[in-house]
């Protein structure tokens, strides 16, 4: 069995794990997440600990993947995930219009981004965007989509970047 799958997953208080023949659902204070259970992966719940095992040697690799996804689901419904974006550039601003995000990124028109269900967008300052949600994958997808509107360019570093992201700069062409 894979090293990841051998490690049991602990269930914090307030989190409920429900395993059905083809579906795994995790319910907690931040919402409910579901996952299609792969064939050949067994989940045993013992109190506040869940252990995974593969009943087929060909399913050993997927067992570790399911364990990692399950751990992220449990963390998501109990604590949640967030991704912070920064806007770098003159006139680059973000503002909330109700539940929609309005971005001024140097185009002739402002971009309006509608937050998908289960994702919360907020702007602590005009140059920061906070993407929050219970599903780690969807939080990352939404953050990547917003970053994709104006990715950072290597000459001046202008654009939308993740907080803490290092942009490798290039030197301008000499005449």
Swiss-Prot record:
Part of the 50S ribosomal subunit. GO terms for molecular function: rRNA binding; structural constituent of ribosome. InterPro entries: Ribosomal_uL6-like (IPR000702), Ribosomal_uL6-like_a/b-dom_sf (IPR036789), Ribosomal_uL6_a/b-dom (IPR020040), Ribosomal_uL6_bac-type (IPR019906), Ribosomal_uL6_CS (IPR002358). This is Large ribosomal subunit protein uL6. Belongs to the universal ribosomal protein uL6 family. This protein binds to the 23S rRNA, and is important in its secondary structure. It is located near the subunit interface in the base of the L7/L12 stalk, and near the tRNA binding site of the peptidyltransferase center. GO terms for cellular component: cytosolic large ribosomal subunit. One of its GO terms (biological process) is cytoplasmic translation. Pfam families: Ribosomal_L6. Keywords: Ribonucleoprotein, Ribosomal protein, RNA-binding, rRNA-binding. The gene is rplF. It comes from the Bacteria.
